[in-house]
Amino acid sequence: MNTFQADWGEIPQMPKDQVFTPQDQLTNYNDNMMDNLLDFNYNDVDALLSEELKDLDIPLAPSPRDLNMNAEQSLNWMQDIQGHRSNKPSMSHKRGMSGTAIFGFKNHNKTLSIASFSKNTDIINEAENENVKGNTDNQNGFVLSQVLLKQQEELRLALEKQKEVNRNLERQLRENRLQQEHIQRVLHDQEAVTSQLTAQNVTESPSKQRSPTKYQGDDAIIVTKNSSSGGYVFPPPPRVTLNNEAVTPPLSFSRFSNIDQMESSDPLNYLQPNADFTEAYASHKTPESSFGKEHASVLSTSEFLRPTNAARESSSKAMYSSPNSMISPHRKKDSVLSTVSTILQPQDDYQNTASPPSQMLNLEEANLENEQKNNGKMLRAPVEIMPTIPGSKNNTPMTANKSGFMPQKHTFQHTPVKAKNNVDMNERSLVRPELSGTPLNKSVQNGMHFREEDDSNILHHISEIPQGSTSHNNTTAGDDSNVSNRLQFSNTESSPSRQRKKPTTLPPGYIDRYVKELPDKNFECLFPNCGKFFRRRYNIKSHIQTHLEDKPYKCDFEGCTKAFVRNHDLARHKKTHDKHFSCPCGKKFSSEQSMMKHKNRHNCTGPARVPDSKMVSKSPRKQSSPTKLSSAIMNSPIKENYLKENTNLHIDQLRMDPKMRNALEDGGLLKPVERTEAMAFPSPLSGYSDLGSPFRDLGTIEE
């Protein structure tokens, strides 16, 4: 582009004072309009075209505005053009082949190369890009400014909200501070009042501090607690009226934080003339009885309630006036008010103390007893039938008072329990009975124990144990009644009865190790190499006891050392010791077969021996039961003498073979049994069914 301007600069210019004609003005006007319409400079287009024409080796003619130049100048211009054409090299692409073949030139290619135009286009594009970039930057700046303004507005709103929250917090803090100051003032006032009250209590006299509270109603009750023994003592010592002045032994009471809230009421007194309380107390004993107004008069006319002896009055006042010299029957405790229904129980706190109040009460009881005897109305204390309360000093059944009047002191509990007998026992001597053999017979000799897994049920079935089976180290022959009472008491106090566990000499739960309960309610033995199944737990436990050689049932017969797993096995064994079969030589046997063997061994002086080969062998199923046969023989009073002499002989005849018996009879060695009316021998049982009826055989022999 600069090259073109330099080239055009060599063209001779028109003088400045040259005057343009109207035609020239019109031409200039048209040129200006074209420049304005096409929006580019005419000189630039001219230079562009001139450059392209030079590349195409096309000679250039002067422009119309240069027509007024003189000839010399024109010639010079032509020469300059030629010289410039010959001397100045091409600035485009070293005059390479251009795409001018479209114009019909020879040896020209079809590739169009317009370097200057592309450069100009690049310049225009760069300018446009700069304009677009500037516009984009302006737009981005506007958007950014809008965002910043919006954020500033949001921050301003948030700041205002935070200021409002801060103001609310400050207001709450001020209110809390005021409340705390008010609470501190109230606490300070309360502390001041408390300190004043404490100072007043400290400066009070001991008698005022220990003065009892007065109850509002007659049915109010003092419940004492925090005593040395941990029990409750009720009622307080009675008030004694001396010259119309009520004197009450002091009773300690708990200090309340606010003394104004303490209730005042009179202590309960059994000896004061109060008919309503007397009726209420009598109804506690028996609802049907009436302990009413007539007895109130008896109490009011007591000599002790209005004594005339001045010495007694002075001694009583001296006793209650000084708290140091007085012996209070109450232990140190705190008392509170309660209206809970109570149960009274005496307590022997005054047995070993000869205090003046107890002596005075004894005198009072004696006077009341005399007056009641005179009036024919003897009253008994209703509390003698009350049960023992846990927590009292002595848990023994109370007995009637000698004077027949109220006891001196009582204990208070909410829940009564059964009384316990005052009988010395050795650490559950009735709880774990020692049993052996039959559990209900002779249970001490062999030392077999019932092992209970649950101690809460150890007293069940205790009534089944006979008196001879219990052993006590301190029990004498005169305590049989106490033992029976103790057994009865254990029965009533025991937990619900449960079936006794199976006796065993093994530790608890040892047998269960070998028991496996199956889903089908069967049981499998887990003992090595066993694997048997049972349908009942009792059976499998007995089976396992045979594996473990656990035989708790021992025979108590003298000289017998056998033991069994089951009780019925022991019972069957004991029958072997019952010898109902006696030999003429004096020996006794438990079975007939044993007796016959004895006779056949030449050890007996009885009848002749029968050969063993001739003995009739019977099936064990058909042998008679020795118990049934012996009972049939021994229970017949008509044939007692006859059977005593002839039973053994008759049995021998029945045991013989018929042919053997006939041979002996023919030889005169065996005398047949005669038929008599006295011979009403009972028919043999099933054991002799194979021989038939003995009378039929005898009848055959006689024939």
From Swiss-Prot:
InterPro entries: GLI_C2H2-zinc-finger, Znf_C2H2_sf, Znf_C2H2_type
Family matches, as SUPFAM superfamilies: beta-beta-alpha zinc fingers
The UniProt record lists the keyword Transcription: yes
Gene disruption phenotype: Leads to systemic infections characterized by fungal escape from the vasculature, tissue penetration, proliferation in vivo, and considerable overstimulation of the pro-inflammatory arm of the innate immune response.
Zinc finger map (C2H2-type): 523-547, 553-577, 581-602
Residues covered by region (Disordered): 197-216, 312-333, 465-509, 599-635
A single GO BP: cell adhesion
One Pfam family linked to the record: zf-C2H2
Superkingdom per UniProt: Eukaryota
Cell compartments where the protein resides: Nucleus
GO molecular function, one term: RNA polymerase II cis-regulatory region sequence-specific DNA binding
Keyword Transcription regulation among UniProt keywords: yes
Entry's Gene Ontology cellular component terms: cytosol; nucleus
Coiled-coil regions, chain positions: 148-187
Record keywords: Cell adhesion, Cell wall biogenesis/degradation, Coiled coil, Metal-binding, Nucleus, Repeat, Transcription, Transcription regulation, Virulence, Zinc, Zinc-finger
Biased composition (Polar residues): 197-214, 312-327, 466-497, 622-634
PANTHER family the UniProt entry points to: METALLOTHIONEIN EXPRESSION ACTIVATOR-RELATED (PTHR19818:SF144), ZINC FINGER PROTEIN ZIC AND GLI (PTHR19818)
Function: Transcription factor involved in the RAM (regulation of ACE2 transcription factor and polarized morphogenesis) signaling network that regulates polarized morphogenesis. Regulates expression of genes involved in cell separation or other cell wall genes. Required for regulation of morphogenesis, cell separation, adherence, biofilm formation, invasion, as well as virulence.
Protein name: Cell wall transcription factor ACE2
The encoding gene: ACE2
